């Protein structure tokens, strides 16, 4: 499938793929995770098409085939541009595809962006699905300070193993008898190998991108949202996913969502699965829950 190019508010290109069908029930807008790309969601889009939904995927800035620099978002305010890009895509779905029933799907870092989008734009979406969702952590401000300090010596466009380890090291160590440092994403060796061998996956973030990521994480803890529409939200994760933070992390996520006005929540966790539940060997269980959620009238 060819890319469709649209422009962000700063005139930078956003590359999307449109999996459109006739007379769709709605459109699922997909926000992928950190250090991956939209083509890893082809199976998801195909399955959602069969359920009667159009799908629009996109590559985040600094990700995918068409980016100028892997792991780099923008010279400044990259966190805000990542949010506005998704609003631009939503406008495309509404105004070009003429679909107003939009379900927002975010995986991992994509779920962080999705939650930041909801703070001021919740009325644009009928339902939300958050997969492998990270939670707000009190150490985020310290991480942001550390990134700022490191950038004095390496510049914002440089990379830092210290920040790589601070952000991802805990996830890697969560799998005790790991064969690779990527084992935390999945129990499926095929999926792990596909990720490792994909040149568009696993590329380190620049220092400025880590700053933007930390600012987005801080946004998860915002006290209130604007003109909240309390739509149904499905939270899904593998029980062995270190990103969610087990019960403590999940409770923090629920607490923050509730405080922002979102309490129409449904949570499903899956035994013997890690971070990328859409790519696990038992992924059909996940798709069954998604299909059930899409078909429910939870409003």
Enumerate the language-model features and the residues they cover.
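Alpha/beta-hydrolase-fold enzymes
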Residues: 105, 114-200
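Conserved alpha/beta-hydrolase "acid-adjacent" motif
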Residues: 242-252
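N-terminal cap/lid segment of alpha/beta-hydrolase-fold proteins
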Residues: 1-20
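Conserved acidic catalytic loop of the alpha/beta-hydrolase fold
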Residues: 84-100
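Active-site glycine-rich loops that stabilize anionic/oxyanionic intermediates
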Residues: 25, 32-36, 108, 239-240
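Catalytic active-site module of serine/aspartate enzymes centered on a nucleophile-bearing elbow/loop
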Residues: 260, 264-299
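Conserved alpha/beta-hydrolase
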Residues: 40-70
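Short beta-strand/loop motif that positions the catalytic acidic residue
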Residues: 235-237
